[in-house]
Amino acid sequence: MKPSERRKARRLAVQAIYSWQLSGNNIADVEHEFLTEQSLDGVDVAYFRELFSGVATKKPQLDELIIPHLERPIDEVSPVEKAIVRLATYELTFRKDVPYKVAINEAIELAKAFGADESHKFVNGLLDKLVARK
């Protein structure tokens, strides 16, 4: 498996998490939609599934880790930033095989791709605080 396959899986997972957060649809339905309606060329599908279902099923636990490092209520964080931070927090917490620097860098790249102009700074700062606490 190439690193780019995981990068593509993360990118697709952030989109699925974002969609799930906004729609409130069933996890299985959102996953099915993304697996059938998106191009999966070069995507580590198993990793996508793990990230998406992991974030969706462990959202309360992930938010408990994230909230102490926020300077505003989590409801005021943009849905894109929430999706990215939840995904990175999942990797940092449950995927010990992923070096923390890789998880943070990938999250920053996702924030640059999908977030507002300053999203990458917010994501980097929050994840740095989360890692420093561990």
UniProtKB/Swiss-Prot annotation:
Keyword annotations from UniProtKB, A to Z: RNA-binding, Transcription, Transcription antitermination, Transcription regulation
Keyword Protease annotated: no
Keyword Cell membrane in record: no
Record-linked Gene3D superfamilies: NusB-like
Function field: Involved in transcription antitermination. Required for transcription of ribosomal RNA (rRNA) genes. Binds specifically to the boxA antiterminator sequence of the ribosomal RNA (rrn) operons.
Protein name (record): Transcription antitermination protein NusB
GO biological process terms on file: DNA-templated transcription termination; transcription antitermination
GO molecular function: RNA binding
NCBIfam families: nusB (TIGR01951)
Gene Ontology terms: cellular component: cytosol
Similarity annotation: Belongs to the NusB family.
